Amino acid sequence: MSAKGCLALCLTFVSMFFGIAEGRADSALTFENGKIQFAGIEMPYRVAHVGGTGNPSLVVYLHGGSSKGNDNEKPLNEAATDSISRYLESRHIESIVLVPQCPADKSWGGPMLEVLKSLIDKYAEECTDFYILGGSMGGTGTWSMLSVYPGLFTAAMPVAGNPSKCDADHVAQTPVFTVMGTADRIMNVEETSDFVDQLHAHQGIAEFEVEEGWTHEMTCIQSYTTRRLDWVFSHRRNPSSIEKATMGGSERRVVGYYSFDGKALSEPPIKGAYIVRYAGNCGEYSTLKKMK
């Protein structure tokens, strides 16, 4: 075989391998194109509907830095998009999956958090539970969303991200499963470990796993296992009985109502979604309630 033929064969095997790791060629889900504008920022996104049972969930995946742009295509090629979509299908979880794309000149922080919130608001009325997951820049963005919008999400899974600038008290209001790799040269494992300790100190529910030898890229690709996703999606809300929500087996009382932007409400609205703050002998906790 000629050198050119050998090279072509090698490239074929390489593309086959990475097609499995990063592609979505055989995914059953159809992602439709969408676009949203907020505060002068235009953000493309993809949306797919997963059929299943029960009340629908809203699932948001935040991509890493290499998928920024406006083609509305690169985020779908990330391995996590496929892993999460397949999981939802296999578990028959009725859900709306959102995969937004960050503009090339921005990151998942600052004003982009408000843009993401406006996208979530667009679909909030249809869903009972909200989940957010992300890797690398998307992992950091996931941490940031938990910090800026405490109690909005039912559970979250940031991987290979940086939570060091986040408010641990706010983040602790959402159950979190995070993963890091010992060979990650971009994110700091110790910083994440310290932050998880802070979450525990605030009575937060947080799982932290460190994979030996995993690089930054490996962590972003391989973290979304069935076992971990089972943990994330095992957290559910029950809007019909939210006033009797318990934590640690104790009854809790309502101490306040808030809009999604943190403004205190004198009473719950007669329509729409809002946040309820509870208090009890296990501390305070925020969760979402919907009125139709």
PLM-predicted stretches and their roles:
Residues 65, 102-103, 137, 182-185, ...:
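Acidic beta-to-alpha connecting loop that harbors the catalytic carboxylate
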Residues 58, 62-114:
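Active-site machinery of serine-nucleophile hydrolases
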Residues 177-179, 185-239:
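C-terminal catalytic histidine-bearing segment of alpha/beta-hydrolase fold enzymes
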Residues 240, 245, 273-292:
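C-terminal tail/sorting-segment detector
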Residues 237-263:
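Residue-level detector of functionally pivotal "anchor" positions at catalytic/ligand-binding pockets or at interdomain
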Residues 51, 104-137, 147-150:
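Gly/Ser-rich "nucleophile elbow"/oxyanion-hole loop immediately N-terminal to the catalytic nucleophile
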Residues 127-172:
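Primarily recognizes the serine-hydrolase "nucleophile elbow" in alpha/beta-hydrolase
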Residues 6, 19-58, 95, 135, ...:
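A domain-start/cap signature at the N-terminus of enzymes
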